[in-house]
């Protein structure tokens, strides 16, 4: 799956690529959180986790990393500028514990992210759904 980027600013794509790589690594919570402002407001509407501050966002990400195996985010498209991006993605992972341990879950979503002058995420809204279709 190729990524389309409708933004001529390569720095925006590079910033997003680094963030996606940190999420895909799923082991270094400090690295992931280094992309967020201490004043972040983070919401993941699919899981009804809304208006989280920095500490709550960190806890949320850490729990996610510990609840799944083989987390992989694939960028589908990206548009935006230094202040705002809209990123479409596909995520796959395996559940570690539930009645469906090992089940591969596919999700498709969009992240809307706003950035401060330092390039840190100050607001992020994730919208996603479980996806049973092809990833491509």
UniProtKB/Swiss-Prot annotation:
Q: Where is the signal peptide?
A: none
Q: Name the Pfam families on file.
A: SnoaL_2
- The EC code for this enzyme is 5.-.-.-
Q: Name one GO molecular function term.
A: isomerase activity
Q: What is the top-level taxon of the source organism?
A: Eukaryota
Q: Does the keyword Cytoplasm apply?
A: no
Chain's role: Cyclase; part of the gene cluster that mediates the biosynthesis of aurovertins, fungal polyketides that exhibit potent inhibition of adenosine triphosphate synthase.
What transmembrane ranges does the database entry give? none
Read off the InterPro entries from this record.
NTF2-like_dom_sf, SnoaL-like
Q: Which family is this sequence assigned to?
A: Belongs to the aurE cyclase family.
Give the intrachain disulfide bonds.
none
Quick check: keyword Transport in the entry?
no
UniProtKB keywords: Isomerase
Instruction: Give the enzyme's main class according to its UniProt record, as a single word.
Output: isomerase
Name assigned to this protein: Cyclase aurE
Pathway membership: Polyketide biosynthesis
């Amino acid at each position: 799956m190729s990524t389309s980027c409708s933004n001529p600013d390569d720095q925006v794509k590079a910033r997003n690529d680094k963030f996606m790589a940190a999420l895909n690594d799923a082991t270094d919570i400090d690295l992931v959180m280094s992309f967020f402002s201490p004043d972040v407001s983070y919401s993941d509407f699919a899981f009804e986790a809304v208006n989280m501050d920095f500490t709550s966002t960190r806890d949320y990400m850490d729990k996610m990393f510990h609840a799944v195996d083989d987390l992989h985010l694939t960028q589908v498209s990206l548009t935006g500028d230094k202040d705002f991006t809209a990123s479409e993605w596909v995520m796959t992972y395996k559940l570690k514990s539930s009645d469906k341990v090992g089940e591969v879950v596919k999700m498709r979503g969009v992240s809307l992210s706003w950035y401060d002058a330092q390039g840190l995420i100050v607001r992020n809204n994730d919208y996603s759904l479980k996806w049973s279709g092809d990833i491509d």
